[in-house]
From Swiss-Prot:
Gene Ontology BP, a term: 'de novo' IMP biosynthetic process
Record flagged with keyword Heme: no
Class of this enzyme: ligase
Name of protein: Phosphoribosylformylglycinamidine cyclo-ligase
Localisation: Cytoplasm
An example molecular function term from Gene Ontology annotations: phosphoribosylamine-glycine ligase activity
Catalytic activity: 2-formamido-N(1)-(5-O-phospho-beta-D-ribosyl)acetamidine + ATP = 5-amino-1-(5-phospho-beta-D-ribosyl)imidazole + ADP + phosphate + H(+)
Keyword terms, alphabetized: ATP-binding, Cytoplasm, Ligase, Nucleotide-binding, Purine biosynthesis
Length: 344
């Protein structure tokens, strides 16, 4: 046993135990194109085997942010990996790409195999939902950088799309209909404000139960995994129905919807056209946050906004319903230069 490294606070044996525990979770994410298993210096993927004509790779990386604090307080680590995958693959699918593979990075103060297995099991769950293979990762034990019960989680994904089917919003026109796909709740953005409003200002704890949240523990509601939209959106891409997609993450509607719009166009969003999960009202009241500012911070119940030609909206809604996805007509595209998003 490498005693000197152990004395420095790094457990080599615990690292071996983590690898042993996660192998079965990694195996269930296997998909066509995967060449190598975990354990090599890099993960191998055979793009040629998938039959693309003009493949364009789209990459994305993200983390979970301070939602990890809620996981720590609840001592619940089996879904936070889904959040990590979702934050990455939802960005990639917003440009029309099918996620192919994923890699994770975990940094911790002390290597706890039981906790890290829970984290990676969630990553694997997210990969299965997204159709992406978990082909590699890194677990870094960093005593002195993190407390023993702390860890950080980030991920990286690569997806692929035919060049002719890239979704970049360039064909969006005034009159296009905006369809919203519901979120599961807060997802993984805004948790610094969430914690300040709920725990500091309102004095709640993760174990507080509120009637407006069906008496569920607040921490349980906040840990609801970020929704993965890959399987809902891919049929729309295959039918060439989508002109643009906005992933509603940090910055809410105000920052994210304009990212898909050409210059000179804006989004007119009809408030009340979709249900807003009650957790947002709880946060707004607890933190005394201006109602309209909430739309500049959170997803407010919509994780994706999709631009569709008016004459193809019914077709898109039918495909979404067939995929088991509830969708709402939430607005339309207008000609406007100054304000890029109208919320009314």
């Amino acid at each position: 046993m490498p005693q000197a490294y152990e004395n420095a606070g790094v457990s080599v044996e615990a690292g071996y135990e983590v690898v042993k525990r996660i192998k079965s979770h990694v195996a269930r994410t296997n998909r066509p194109g995967v060449v190598s298993g975990i354990g090599g210096f890099g993960g191998l993927f055979d793009l040629a085997s998938l039959g693309y004509n003009e493949p364009v790779l789209i990459s994305g990386t993200d983390g979970v942010g301070t939602k990890l604090v809620i996981a720590k307080l609840m001592d619940k680590h089996d879904t936070i990996g889904i959040d990590c995958v979702a934050m990455c693959v939802n960005d990639v699918v917003a440009q029309g790409a099918q996620p192919l593979f994923f890699l994770d990075y975990i940094a911790c103060g002390k290597n706890d195999p039981a906790v890290l297995e829970q984290v990676v099991s969630g990553v694997a769950d997210g990969c299965v939902q997204a159709g992406a293979a978990l082909i590699g990762g890194e677990t870094a034990e960093m005593p002195g950088m993190y407390d023993e019960d702390e860890y950080d989680l980030a991920g990286f994904t690569v997806g692929c799309v035919e060049r002719s089917k890239i979704v970049d919003g360039s064909t969006i026109e005034a009159g296009d209909v905006l369809i919203g796909l519901p979120s599961t709740g807060v997802h993984s953005n805004g948790f610094s404000l969430v914690r300040k409003a709920l725990f500091e200002q309102a004095g709640y704890t993760v174990h507080t139960r509120l009637p407006e949240l069906d008496d569920r523990e607040l921490g349980d509601v906040l840990l609801t995994p970020t929704k993965i939209y890959v399987k809902a959106l891919m049929p729309l891409f295959e039918a060439n129905l989508v002109r643009g997609v906005a992933h509603i993450t940090g910055g809410g509607f105000i920052e994210n919807v304009p990212r898909m719009l050409p210059e000179g166009l804006a989004a007119s969003i009809e408030l009340g056209s979709w249900p807003v999960p009650p957790i947002f009202d709880v946060i707004e009241k607890a933190g005394d946050v201006d109602h309209m500012e909430m739309y500049n911070i959170f997803n407010m119940g919509l994780g994706m906004v999709v631009a569709i030609r008016p004459d193809r909206v019914d077709e898109a809604m039918n495909l979404l319903e067939h995929a088991g996805e509830k969708a709402y007509r939430v607005g339309h595209v207008i000609e406007q230069v100054n304000e890029r998003v109208d919320l009314a």
